[in-house]
């Protein structure tokens, strides 16, 4: 059951990415009609370069934006030993361990691959969770590392950036350029305008969908590592019950945290990078029946 869930989640992510890439290519070719293919290729290269910078420096940026401080075993033996035991269990390299001095209970993982991984927990999380719950949360974060989720999110980020740049350039060309050249009928003009307005919104929704799928996958991977899904389910319930905004908020890294760090409200639900906590807990309890 658990292995089939993990396999299904990976397939879902692949299908979303595959359709997204095809859609981006189609939109790009349509945009090339107005921008010219050389300019279109320039925008793609620019977006790819931006994504590469994010890929190689995302770990450092996340640490800086969160205000996390690197620790050793002596600084917090409980957190360090938990991560070390999970590293041994999963066969992954020992990641750098950080603590964020913030009363909001939360945790995140970052790094482009297991060799460059970083995991962090807030002081608030360490205060409210017992040892088994802490292990469940950190197993979830190590699951992100094991599943190369930072790499997946970087690919999606690059595609979203490309769509945004292309859309912006197309809209500028439609508004200020001469679009009455041969072949650019009023109908094609309207079609390109429609997709230029719609594409960034659709791209963002795809990004959110991928993020939610990866959260489910990390939950399942973490549960499989500890063989105790109930601990992670209990931790998620505590995180939801004690949720509060982080002192240093950044929407650009909201998807990294195990629990949505943004303030509650209608738009948080609509554009959430995380699936509903109730559904995550339900799935974990269902997995628990397999042990």
UniProtKB/Swiss-Prot annotation:
CDD domains, per the entry: M48B_Htpx_like (cd07340)
According to the record, cofactor stoichiometry and binding are noted as: Binds 1 zinc ion per subunit.
Broad class of where this protein is predominantly found: membrane
Return the Gene3D superfamilies for the record.
Answer: Metalloproteases ('zincins'), catalytic domain
Q: Where in the cell is it found?
A: Cell membrane
Q: Give the E.C. number(s).
A: 3.4.24.-
Q: Which domain of life is it from?
A: Bacteria
Q: Enumerate the Pfam families for this protein.
A: Peptidase_M48
Q: Which InterPro entries match?
A: HtpX_protease, Pept_M48_protease_HtpX, Peptidase_M48
Catalytic residues of the enzyme: 141
Q: Does the keyword Chaperone apply?
A: no
**One GO BP annotation of this record:** proteolysis
- The residue ranges crossing the membrane are 11-31, 34-54, 155-175, 186-206
Q: Which cofactor does it need?
A: Zn(2+)
Quick one: which residues bind Zn(2+)? 140, 144, 215
An MF annotation (GO) of this entry: metalloendopeptidase activity
Record keywords, A-Z: Cell membrane, Hydrolase, Membrane, Metal-binding, Metalloprotease, Protease, Transmembrane, Transmembrane helix, Zinc
Please report the record's description of how this protein sits within the membrane: Multi-pass membrane protein
Q: Does the keyword Zinc apply?
A: yes
Per the record, what is one GO cellular component? plasma membrane
Recorded family membership: Belongs to the peptidase M48B family.
Against HAMAP family, the record matches this protein to: Pept_M48_protease_HtpX
Q: What is this protein called?
A: Protease HtpX homolog
Q: Which gene encodes it?
A: htpX
């Amino acid at each position: 059951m658990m292995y089939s869930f993990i396999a299904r989640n990976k397939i879902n992510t692949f299908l979303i990415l595959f359709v997204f890439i095809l859609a981006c290519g189609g939109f790009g070719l349509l945009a090339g009609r107005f921008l010219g293919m050389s300019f279109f290729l320039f925008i793609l290269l620019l977006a790819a370069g931006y994504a590469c910078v994010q890929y190689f420096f995302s770990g450092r940026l996340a640490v800086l934006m969160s205000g996390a401080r690197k620790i050793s075993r002596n600084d917090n033996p409980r957190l360090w030993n938990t991560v070390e035991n999970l590293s041994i269990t999963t066969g992954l390299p020992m990641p750098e361990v950080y603590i964020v001095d913030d009363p909001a209970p939360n945790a995140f993982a970052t790094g482009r691959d297991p060799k460059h991984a970083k995991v962090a927990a807030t002081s608030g999380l360490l205060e409210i969770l017992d040892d088994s719950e802490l292990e469940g949360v950190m197993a979830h974060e190590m699951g992100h590392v094991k599943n190369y989720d930072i790499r997946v999110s970087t690919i999606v980020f690059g595609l979203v950036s490309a769509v945004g740049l292309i859309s912006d350039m197309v809209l500028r060309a439609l508004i200020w350029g001469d679009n009455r050249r041969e072949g650019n009928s009023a109908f094609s003009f309207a079609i390109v305008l429609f997709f230029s307005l719609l594409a960034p919104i659709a791209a963002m929704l795809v990004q959110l969908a991928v993020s939610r799928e990866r959260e489910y996958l990390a939950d399942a991977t973490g549960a499989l590592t500890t063989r105790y899904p109930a601990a992670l389910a209990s931790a998620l319930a505590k995180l939801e019950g004690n949720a509060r905004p982080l002192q240093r908020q950044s929407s650009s890294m909201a998807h990294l945290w195990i629990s949505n760090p943004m303030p509650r409200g209608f738009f948080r639900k609509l554009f959430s990078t995380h699936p509903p906590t109730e559904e995550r807990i339900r799935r974990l309890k269902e997995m628990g029946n397999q042990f």
